[in-house]
């Protein structure tokens, strides 16, 4: 998301432009002659030579995940590029990434002080915040406690093991009806369009305790806001890397700030309503759970760092935004892969038919008996690598990695796409093959292989909603596979070339779906 620098859109006078150019040149000259002392015994970071002002932007502008993967083959798993005026260290390779994020996790646990981060959730975002370690840990602990509490929240009826299972199963069943209805009317459907609304509904249910009809304007407004956010963030903000540009007119940045303001206001309204109706003995959703844990901390005299009520809004905002885009993108890719590999689709259906049957809806408890489905999900994560990079990291002190010196406050990119396609780690990485994650006889999931897949980050900055996200993808997909057969629409061949952005999505397409014999054994 931050690897692109686009032209500044807006009316800039000639005098303003000249002042900006002169200033940029002076800053560049100062930076050029600034010398970083390398401690004895350590090496200077390798990397391509940057151009004045713009750095290496032209070399990484198009498909940065591929450009930086090619650079890693030349410079190694630790190298440096320059985006605008900001040095950026790029990490590739499974061992190097694990060394940095797990064994040296404290050193790389920061977030860079990027200009655009200040406007996400009013600067209170848990994922993007540059808060000091103690404050960030307190907020992360609060969020994780709230998620654990929600994970054990009971459903409204005994047939569901938990609230999450109830939300996803009901919405998954409704999605099946929606797709069959659209097929009756139009003869084909856009998978992303319908999946994104269903996922948004589940997230609304989990975070806010609300479920909407699929044509509800408030729900569709949230979907549109998320799409706008992804487009704007995916195109990048030049001011993150050329500081002087933040003082010039920038329509893209104005739009970015407007989207954040609108969504913050929406979440603030719902959180305020939750405070008014909050009942400690009746926790309804994640927002209630956050309020509950926040109230407990206020009563704890031993709590060194208190989390303000307003930061609850930021945490809810993060959970909604991250879960919404990630899950909808993963599920949409899954349906496209099912169409591209019909023989795998039939194997998955047969597994569900044998282990679950065609009478009842799949449950979370069935997951352990569906190794092929779990392997399929892992291979979607690996092969599509729809999250090609983690949110940028930052070093919180001078450190070293693989013998190279990395100064404090250095921006760090983690190339997840490279790790997921590294020929030293995977056999035939360009091939889509779920069996790579199964035991030799195909009856068990190889968890050690599965742990190599990078999608949710690692260790201290690992996505806190990972467990919920994985379960959501599994349940949705199990229900769809059990009841529907997906096919390519004649005359509309699939194009699986990913489109780079905040999350990499497949090109929009039209597919067909037909009902399998539901409610009876085939």
UniProtKB/Swiss-Prot annotation:
Liver. Its EC number is 1.14.14.1. It comes from Oncorhynchus mykiss (Rainbow trout). It is a peripheral membrane protein. It catalyses: an organic molecule + reduced [NADPH--hemoprotein reductase] + O2 = an alcohol + oxidized [NADPH--hemoprotein reductase] + H2O + H(+). Induction: By 3-methylcholanthrene (3MC). The gene is cyp1a1. Belongs to the cytochrome P450 family. Keywords: Endoplasmic reticulum, Heme, Iron, Membrane, Metal-binding, Microsome, Monooxygenase, Oxidoreductase. Heme binds at residue 463. InterPro entries: Cyt_P450 (IPR001128), Cyt_P450_CS (IPR017972), Cyt_P450_E_grp-I (IPR002401), Cyt_P450_E_grp-I_CYP1 (IPR008066), Cyt_P450_sf (IPR036396). Its cofactor is heme. PROSITE patterns: CYTOCHROME_P450 (PS00086). SUPFAM superfamilies: Cytochrome P450 (SSF48264). One of its GO terms (biological process) is hormone biosynthetic process. GO terms for molecular function: heme binding; iron ion binding; steroid 17-alpha-monooxygenase activity. It is found in: Endoplasmic reticulum membrane; Microsome membrane. This is Cytochrome P450 1A1. GO terms for cellular component: basal plasma membrane; cytoplasm; endoplasmic reticulum membrane; heterochromatin; microvillus membrane; nuclear membrane; perinuclear region of cytoplasm; rough endoplasmic reticulum. It is an enzyme of class 1 (oxidoreductase). Disulfide bonds: none annotated. Cytochromes P450 are a group of heme-thiolate monooxygenases. They oxidize a variety of structurally unrelated compounds, including steroids, fatty acids, and xenobiotics. It holds the Pfam family p450. It comes from the Eukaryota.
């Amino acid at each position: 998301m931050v690897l692109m620098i686009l032209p500044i859109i807006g009316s800039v006078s000639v005098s303003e432009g000249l002042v900006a150019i002169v200033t940029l040149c002076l800053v560049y000259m100062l930076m050029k002659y600034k010398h970083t002392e390398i401690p004895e015994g350590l090496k200077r970071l390798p990397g391509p030579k940057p151009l004045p002002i713009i750095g290496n932007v032209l070399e990484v502008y198009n498909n940065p995940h591929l450009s930086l993967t090619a650079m890693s083959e030349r410079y190694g798993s630790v190298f440096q590029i320059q985006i605008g005026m900001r040095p950026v260290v790029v990490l590739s390779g499974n061992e190097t990434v694990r060394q940095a994020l797990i064994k040296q996790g404290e050193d790389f646990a920061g977030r860079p002080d990027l200009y655009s981060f200040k406007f996400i959730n009013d600067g209170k975002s848990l994922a993007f915040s540059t808060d000091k370690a103690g404050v960030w840990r307190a907020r992360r602990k609060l969020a994780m406690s709230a998620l654990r509490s929600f994970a054990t929240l009971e459903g409204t009826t005994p047939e569901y093991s938990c609230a999450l299972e109830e939300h996803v199963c009901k919405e998954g069943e409704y999605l099946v009806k929606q797709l069959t209805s659209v097929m009756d009317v139009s003869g084909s459907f856009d998978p992303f369009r319908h999946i994104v609304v269903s996922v948004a509904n589940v997230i609304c249910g989990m975070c806010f305790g609300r479920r909407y009809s699929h044509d509800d304007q408030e729900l569709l407004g949230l979907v549109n806001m998320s799409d706008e956010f992804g487009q704007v963030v995916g195109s990048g903000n030049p001011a993150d890397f050329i500081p002087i540009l933040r003082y010039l007119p920038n329509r893209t940045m104005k739009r970015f700030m407007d989207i954040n303001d609108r969504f913050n206001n929406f979440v603030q309204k719902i959180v305020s309503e939750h405070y008014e109706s909050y009942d400690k003995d009746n926790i309804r959703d994640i927002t209630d759970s956050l309020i509950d844990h926040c109230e407990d901390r206020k009563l704890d005299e031993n709590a060194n760092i208190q989390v303000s009520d307003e930061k609850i809004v930021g945490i809810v905002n993060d959970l909604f935004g991250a879960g919404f885009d990630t899950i909808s993108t993963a599920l949409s890719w899954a349906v496209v892969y099912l169409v591209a590999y019909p023989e795998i689709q039939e194997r998955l259906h047969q597994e569900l038919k044998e282990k679950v049957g065609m009478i009842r809806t799949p449950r979370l408890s069935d997951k352990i008996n569906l190794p092929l489905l779990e392997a399929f999900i892992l291979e979607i994560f690996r092969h599509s690598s729809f999250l090609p990079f983690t949110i940028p990291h930052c070093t919180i002190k001078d450190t070293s990695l693989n013998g190279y010196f990395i100064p404090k406050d250095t921006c760090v990119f983690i190339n997840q796409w490279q790790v997921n396609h590294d020929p030293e780690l995977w056999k035939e990485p360009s091939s889509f093959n779920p069996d790579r994650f199964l035991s030799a006889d195909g009856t068990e999931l190889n968890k050690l292989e599965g742990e190599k897949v990078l999608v949710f980050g690692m260790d201290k900055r690992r996505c806190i909603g990972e467990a919920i996200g994985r379960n959501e993808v599994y349940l949705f997909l199990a229900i769809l596979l059990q009841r529907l057969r997906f096919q390519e629409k004649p005359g509309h061949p699939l194009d699986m070339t990913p489109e780079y952005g905040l999350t990499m999505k497949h090109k929009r397409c039209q597919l067909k779906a037909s009902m399998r014999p539901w409610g009876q054994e085939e």
